[in-house]
Curated annotation (Swiss-Prot):
Its main location: cytoplasm. It is found in: Cytoplasm. It catalyses: [[Fe-S] cluster scaffold protein carrying a second [4Fe-4S](2+) cluster] + N(6)-octanoyl-L-lysyl-[protein] + 2 oxidized [2Fe-2S]-[ferredoxin] + 2 S-adenosyl-L-methionine + 4 H(+) = [[Fe-S] cluster scaffold protein] + N(6)-[(R)-dihydrolipoyl]-L-lysyl-[protein] + 4 Fe(3+) + 2 hydrogen sulfide + 2 5'-deoxyadenosine + 2 L-methionine + 2 reduced [2Fe-2S]-[ferredoxin]. HAMAP family: Lipoyl_synth. It comes from Saccharolobus solfataricus (strain ATCC 35092 / DSM 1617 / JCM 11322 / P2) (Sulfolobus solfataricus). SUPFAM superfamilies: Radical SAM enzymes. This is Lipoyl synthase.
Amino acid sequence: MEKKVQIAVYENENFKRVAEIVKKKSIATVCEEALCPNIMECWGSGTATFMIMGSICTRGCRFCYVLKGKPSPLDDEEPKRVAEAVKEMELDYVVITSVDRDDLSDGGAQHFANVVKTVKELNPGIIVEVLTPDFRGNIDAVKKVIDAGVDVFAHNVETVRRLTPIVRDPRASYEQSLNVLKYAENVIKKSSILLGLGETWDEIVETMRDLRSVGVSILVLSQYMRPSRKQLEVKKRYTLEEFKELEEIAYSMGFSAVISLPLARTSYKAKEAYFRAIENAKNHS
């Protein structure tokens, strides 16, 4: 019998506190903008993923709910507001992501770096994970973000090679994403694959193998869920048993940490995955 996936929906004091801080600081979160199914769990445990550089994306990937259009100019006060919010939430691990900003010459890399540096300065000892766009393949932009003091660098390949032109914006490419990850050096690397878009089992395994070949050590596998009728239809719903089997295959390939669950998203259980990766790296060193 197929096991069902259940979502715990509740509000506690932590949830309310996080919501109040986010509103007070006028900060966008991917939790809200992308309709993440884990918002109750994550905010309820006092964690959030901050989305910088506005909430309007210059790209139109066909799986994504984030609004596409012409973004507003960058807010120079945003690094300070994010850093203060992190401090008020008393976080020791933070995830920072962004929309694509193809309208900016560096894709927003300098602003990303400014946010990371300010968060680190105001919150000594904090672990910072970033989930970045591809910066149009600009490796100098990637290095600029990493050099700001990033502990985990995440960039999502999103889907298998064959489906990339269908699923992602034309300005994205499978090889470009692999190159971004390949040249992200001296940092723990992470990527995610959405399942249920029409890929085959062999293509999933091939994509996992490609990610390992460019040094990715943390892998997230999740079920694609259609956020509205404007996005692509779900082609297949994977069972918990299939997610477990893929997790085992991933570990056999040498990934240090794998989050393989229907409701997983890149930042889901990010802190747990980070420490698991660190521990596994020590055990194999």
